[in-house]
C-alpha cells in the first residue's frame, strides 16, 4: 500500500485487509509506504506481526531528523514517529528508511543513515525528488537537473506480478496510473499487450514515457544501501 491518496496507516480497515490478503495467499509479499506518524504503538506492533515473511516490508518516509523532518512531512510528531518505528521493528519485521534530500536536510544524510542503522532498519535510501519543489523548499546545493536517458522497458509490474488498487477500490495494473483518473484503466490485458509494442497504451506512455519499445528514466538516487 502506498499513499497516492492519503497514508495507508490512516485506513480504518488496513490491518484487516492485510490479514485478508495473507489468508488468500500465504506466500504473498506485503508492503506499505508511510510517514509513520499515524496510529499508536500497539497498531504498529500488530502490523509487524502480520509482516512476518522475509520479503514483507514497511518504507518509512523520514526526511531528516527531529529538527527538519517536519518541514516537508507537515504535522509529523518526531517522538510519536520514533515510538511507532521502534514498536514495528521490535517484532523483527523489515523496515526501510526513505529520505528525500533538500537544501535544509542535505547535511543530515550521514546522521540519518547512522540512526537508521541504530534503530534496526534493514535499508536506507536517500534520494533527490524530481517533483516540483514547493515554496520554501530548496534543492540541495549539489543538485543538478537529472539527465533523461532512453533504455529498454523493464516493467516493474510485470516483474512483481502485482496490481494496483486505488483508494476508491478500482483495480489497475500499476500505481503510476493512479493519478490519471480521467483515463483510469481496469483492463490489465489491454495494458500488457501494449508494453512492448510500437504503439504503447496512451496512459502508460504519459506516465512512463514509453515509446517504440523504450522508456525514459532518470537517475535520482543519491545513496541506497542495505544495512543488514
Question: What spans do the regions from the language model cover?
Answer:
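Short, positively charged
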Residues: 134-150, 197-204
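Short hydrophobic/aromatic beta-strand element in the GNAT-like acyltransferase core
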Residues: 162
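Flexible mid-to-C-terminal extensions adjoining Fe-S/redox cofactors in radical SAM and related proteins
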Residues: 170-228
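Short, acidic, Ser/Thr-enriched surface-loop or helix-capping motifs
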Residues: 165-166
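Flexible glycine/acidic-rich beta-alpha junction loops that bind and position SAM and/or redox cofactors
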Residues: 104, 124-144, 178
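Short, small/polar residue-rich loop motifs at catalytic or cofactor-binding pockets
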Residues: 156-159
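Radical SAM/AdoMet-radical enzyme domain recognition
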Residues: 1-3, 10-115, 119-127
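A C-terminal cap/extension of S-adenosyl-L-methionine-dependent methyltransferases
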Residues: 139-154, 220-228
Amino acid at each position: 500500500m502506498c499513499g497516492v491518496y492519503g497514508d495507508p496507516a490512516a485506513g480504518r480497515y488496513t490491518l484487516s485487509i492485510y490479514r485478508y490478503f495473507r489468508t488468500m495467499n500465504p506466500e504473498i509479499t506485503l508492503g506499505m509506504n508511510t510517514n509513520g506518524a499515524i496510529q499508536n504503538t500497539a497498531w504498529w506492533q500488530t502490523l509487524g506481526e502480520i509482516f512476518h515473511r522475509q520479503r514483507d516490508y514497511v518504507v518509512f518516509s523520514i526526511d531528516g531528523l527531529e529538527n527538519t523532518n517536519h518541514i516537508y512531512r507537515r504535522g509529523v510528531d518526531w517522538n510519536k514517529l520514533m515510538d511507532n518505528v521502534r514498536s514495528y521493528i521490535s517484532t523483527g519485521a523489515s523496515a526501510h528508511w526513505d529520505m528525500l534530500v533538500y537544501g535544509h536536510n542535505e547535511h543530515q544524510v550521514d546522521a540519518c543513515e547512522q540512526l537508521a542503522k541504530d534503530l534496526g532498519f534493514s535499508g536506507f535510501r536517500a534520494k533527490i525528488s524530481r517533483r516540483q519543489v514547493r515554496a520554501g523548499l530548496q534543492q540541495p546545493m549539489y543538485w543538478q537537473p537529472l539527465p533523461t536517458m532512453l533504455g529498454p522497458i523493464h516493467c516493474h509490474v510485470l516483474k512483481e506480478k502485482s496490481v494496483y488498487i486505488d483508494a476508491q477500490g478500482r483495480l489497475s495494473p500499476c500505481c503510476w496510473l493512479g493519478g490519471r483518473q480521467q483515463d483510469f484503466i481496469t483492463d490489465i490485458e489491454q495494458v500488457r499487450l501494449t508494453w512492448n509494442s510500437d504503439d504503447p497504451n496512451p496512459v502508460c506512455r504519459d506516465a512512463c514515457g514509453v515509446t517504440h519499445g523504450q522508456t525514459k528514466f532518470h537517475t535520482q538516487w543519491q545513496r541506497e544501501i542495505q544495512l543488514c
